[in-house]
């Protein structure tokens, strides 16, 4: 549930996705 400082409104999580972040409510989150 920690914001990863990357949005996913128009494109999916990219750099932060490699760290385990996923898209939730238009923002990339880690747990």
Curated annotation (Swiss-Prot):
Pfam families tied to this protein: Cyclotide
First and last residue of the signal peptide: none
Post-translational modification: Contains 3 disulfide bonds. This is a cyclic peptide.
Record flagged with keyword Ribosomal protein: no
Keywords (A to Z) from UniProt: Disulfide bond, Knottin, Plant defense
Keyword Membrane: no
InterPro entries: Cyclotide (IPR005535), Cyclotide_bracelet_CS (IPR012323), Cyclotide_sf (IPR036146)
UniProt cross-link Cyclopeptide (Gly-Asp), position: 1-31
GO BP term, example: defense response
Disulphide bond pairs: 4-21, 8-23, 13-28
Family note: Belongs to the cyclotide family. Bracelet subfamily.
Annotated function: Probably participates in a plant defense mechanism.
Domain notes: The presence of a 'disulfide through disulfide knot' structurally defines this protein as a knottin.
Protein name: Cyclotide cter-C
